[in-house]
Amino acid sequence: GIPIVQTLKESLTGNRITSLEGILNGTGNYILSEMTSKGVSFAPALAEAQEKGYAEADPTLDIDGFDTAHKLVLLIRLAWGVDYPYTKMPIEGIRNLDKMDIDFAREFGYRIKLLGRARMRDGKLEAGVFPTLVNHTYLLARVGGAYNAVRVEGNAVGSLFLHGLGAGSLPTASAVLGDLISIARQNNKLN
């Protein structure tokens, strides 16, 4: 996965984060990318994601937005130090999108992306997960396949964009290994 956790924990500690948004689930993005690029409906795109090992046999967490919501909760905790349960946010997945939705968006110059979004507005945190119309010229609209991307807005750094492979065995193994090394380093500091 992309190094967003370490970025928020270490690199952006001198910033006041104002917003973050991103494609936090590579499986969902792969499905939407297939629907957009190949003109297929949801079911064949999901079947292909499963065949390639991007989607689980039971893809509920990915396609209903809950995996994105769980990741967004973690990013909110790191960015604002707030415990924000996913049950508090609106969550809508991509299960009910069809080819007509994709075609309609494209006709008007948009792509549909499953985004997790959070922002601090007037001292109040707003967050949610939903399929979003994204202008085709915007960076997030150009993220295809099983890739993830996160845009973070900070008062000092401005806009920061991180992008990388987000589904499959290698990115998952890389993220787990990175977490284990981070934990081991932290334990060494404590001893």
State what each model feature region is:
Residues 1-55, 65-67, 74:
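Rossmann-like NAD(P)H-binding beta-loop-alpha module
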Residues 3, 15, 37-44, 63-71, ...:
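Conserved active-site and cofactor/substrate-binding residues in soluble primary-metabolism enzymes
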Residues 18-20, 56-63, 162-167:
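A short glycine-threonine-serine/GTX helix/turn-capping micro-motif
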Residues 46-149:
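Substrate-binding/catalytic subdomain of NAD(P)-dependent oxidoreductase enzymes
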Residues 138-191:
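ATP-dependent carboxylate/acyl-activation modules
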